[in-house]
UniProtKB/Swiss-Prot annotation:
GO molecular function: 2-aminoethylphosphonate-pyruvate transaminase activity
Transferase keyword on record: yes
Cofactor: pyridoxal 5'-phosphate
InterPro entries: Aminotrans_V_dom, NH2EtPonate_pyrv_transaminase, PyrdxlP-dep_Trfase, PyrdxlP-dep_Trfase_major, PyrdxlP-dep_Trfase_small, SP_NH2Trfase/AEP_transaminase
EC number: 2.6.1.37
Superkingdom, natural source: Bacteria
Keywords noted in UniProt: Aminotransferase, Pyridoxal phosphate, Pyruvate, Transferase
Catalytic reactions of this protein: (2-aminoethyl)phosphonate + pyruvate = phosphonoacetaldehyde + L-alanine
Matching HAMAP family: PhnW_aminotrans_5
Family: Belongs to the class-V pyridoxal-phosphate-dependent aminotransferase family. PhnW subfamily.
Name recorded for this polypeptide: 2-aminoethylphosphonate--pyruvate transaminase
GO biological process, one term: organic phosphonate catabolic process
Gene it is expressed from: phnW
Length: 369
């Protein structure tokens, strides 16, 4: 087995740089001025990525990305609102479950796991149901890696006078989203994805006017984004104990993000990773689940080999022993596994991963791929 730390080819947590990990070796006082300045700098840098200064607030929140998604829906959707949830995978299903648990009225529109939702679909659905106030969708559905057509859907939602909530967990920082061109009430992301920080903090880019009007909407004290933002604006501090080391790591990760060249460079590296992965896997006979035109360069789903000697658990452990951690499939009808293209890794690392996978399949005597 490799004695080095494995490379995480997953959708998050990810392999991080030594500099990012080093940033967590310093302790911070949660109410100290230096930490408050760190938080403010972080939010300013995050807003700059979406060109959101002046129109949106960046509201950070402790916890996983799902915490932030739930906070956004609970804060920005009034209790008498109704959400149209667009689904083509497990994370869209989670959006619907959040609405159900929060007691928000909702309807769903579901397409196949390899079929993007179209703007025409959304236009038809909004024409048919005037009671819908908000539309929620996953930008890059992590269960497959499918990319939904966000700009087109956003225009349709805005034309109908409705509000858009975007789960951009697996796309923010790597795929372009400009708040001046894509109208939305909320865009949600997290520290441990394409920014290559560590998990433990989500953040919501909330439309300033919508957030100001959201007082009293939230079902929760801890997840009330209106209260979180108001308190931060007055004091510079988090309401409750912040994940200080996570914030410091993300701040350092953003320095490296900008040194690399920002979003264009991060996108280019991930796209190169994805191409290297797809070409290499095709050469050994492994088929990707999605066609190239709807495949985001974030995570790729592959059909599992048909050979009876293939078993994912054994395959996973053998690849791990060679230094790479993969991800199980999350489809309902087809046996698959997933390989991430993101994190502190480049095309050479992806080539090494493909070689490790090929070696393992030979060791397992898997022939029918």
């Amino acid at each position: 087995m490799s004695t080095a730390a494995p490379i995480l080819l997953t959708p998050g947590p990810l392999t991080t740089s030594a500099r990012t990990r080093q940033a967590m070796l310093v302790d911070w006082g949660s109410w100290d001025r230096d930490f408050n300045q760190l938080t403010a700098s972080l939010c300013q840098q995050l807003l700059a990525i979406i060109n959101g200064a002046g129109t949106h607030h960046c509201v950070p929140l402790q916890g996983s990305g799902t915490f932030a998604v739930e906070a956004a829906i609970g804060t920005l959707v009034p209790r008498d609102g109704k959400v149209l949830v667009l689904i083509n995978g497990a994370y869209g299903q989670r959006l619907a479950k959040i609405c159900k648990v929060l007691g928000r009225a909702y309807s769903t529109f579901e397409t196949a796991e390899d079929e993007p939702t179209t703007a025409a679909d959304v236009d038809r659905l909004l024409q048919a149901d005037a009671s819908i106030t908000h539309v929620a969708l996953i930008h890059c559905e992590t269960s497959t890696g499918i990319l939904n057509p966000l700009p087109d859907i956003a225009r349709v939602v805005a034309n109908h006078g409705k509000r858009l909530i975007i789960d951009a967990m697996s796309s923010f920082g790597a795929l372009p989203i400009d708040a001046s061109e894509v109208p939305f009430d909320a865009l949600i992301a997290a520290s441990g994805k394409c920014l290559e920080g560590v998990p433990g903090m989500g953040f919501v880019f909330a439309n300033q006017a919508s957030l100001a009007a959201a007082e009293g909407n939230s079902h929760s004290l801890a997840m009330d984004l209106h209260d979180q933002h108001s308190y931060m604006a007055k004091t510079g501090q988090w309401r409750f104990t912040p994940p200080t080391h996570v914030v410091a790591a993300l701040h350092e990760a953003l320095l490296q993000y900008n040194e690399e060249g920002g979003l264009p460079a991060r996108h280019q590296r991930y796209a190169s990773n994805c191409k290297t992965l797809l070409d290499g896997m095709a050469a050994i006979g492994l088929r990707s689940f999605l066609p190239a035109d709807i495949q985001a360069p974030i995570i790729v789903t592959f059909h599992a080999p048909r050979d009876a000697r293939y078993a994912f658990k054994d395959f996973y452990e053998r690849v791990k022993a060679k230094g790479f951690i993969l991800y199980p499939g999350k489809l309902t009808q087809v046996e698959t596994f997933r390989v991430g293209c993101i994190g502190c890794v480049g095309p050479d690392g992806m080539s090494a991963a493909v070689n490790a996978i090929a070696e393992v399949l030979r060791e397992m005597e898997v022939l029918d791929i």
